[in-house]
């Protein structure tokens, strides 16, 4: 259950990207796939709480409860999936991660998962929030979170700091999160262990989440970034 007030109003649309272009054949393919994705996918940027509740209800993601609360169902996953979490083994993580307790993922599998998630989202309505992690004005990260579900966008907007208008106008993400609950990963194709995957690439500054409707994965991914980088 997610508590919030409800109000009806107009919605503003903007298109945004969620992945930095990289060098190399695979990453170049991802870059061009993303450009095509931007052309045919509607991405709503920085909607406020009231707008997101309206979107969630319109999409059939939940319903209003007493007092204006938004009631949603997470589906099969009602908690985090720690055994499905992967960190891409790269130069900046190879000697810093305890691989005995953390699952690794190859760069190739991560790129394939990213491309497949982009393809899956084509033609769908998505939501992006430009937010700040950490209340410390000297040490914080700009996080761009793109979600398939409006209530996931509402959830993470409620937990992280919404930048000032000035900061938002000059916003450049330090890290990006892409969350697609309706996409299921394939262990044989993506180098994971189940249909649910949370994969982090510190080199590409990107988190991929799929196969779970539990919104807490967005929050926990941000905590992981802060714990590793700060």
Task: Give names to the regions the model predicted.
Residues 3-8:
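Classical Sec-dependent N-terminal signal peptides that target proteins to the secretory pathway
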Residues 11-229:
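A noncatalytic interaction/capping subdomain that flanks phosphate/NTP-handling catalytic cores
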């Amino acid at each position: 259950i997610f508590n919030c007030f409800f109000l009806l109003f107009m919605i503003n649309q903007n298109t945004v990207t969620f992945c930095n272009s990289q060098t190399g054949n695979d990453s170049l393919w991802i870059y061009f796939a993303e450009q095509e994705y931007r052309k045919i996918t509607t991405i709503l940027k920085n909607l406020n709480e009231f707008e997101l509740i309206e979107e969630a209800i319109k999409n059939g993601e939940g319903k209003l409860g007493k007092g204006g609360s938004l009631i949603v169902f997470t589906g099969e996953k009602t908690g985090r999936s720690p055994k499905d979490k992967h960190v891409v083994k790269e130069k900046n993580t190879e000697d810093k991660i305890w691989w005995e307790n953390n699952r690794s993922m190859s760069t190739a599998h991560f790129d394939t998962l990213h491309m497949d998630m982009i393809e899956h989202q084509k033609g769908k309505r998505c939501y992006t929030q430009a937010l700040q992690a950490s209340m410390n004005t000297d040490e914080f990260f700009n996080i761009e979170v793109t979600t398939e579900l409006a209530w996931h966008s509402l959830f993470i907007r409620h937990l992280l700091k919404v930048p000032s208008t000035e900061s938002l106008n000059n916003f450049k993400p330090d890290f990006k999160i892409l969350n697609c609950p309706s996409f299921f990963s394939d262990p044989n194709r993506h180098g994971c262990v189940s249909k649910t995957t949370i994969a982090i690439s510190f080199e590409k500054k990107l988190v991929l989440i799929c196969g779970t409707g539990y919104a807490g994965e967005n929050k926990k991914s941000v905590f992981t970034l802060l714990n590793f980088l700060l």
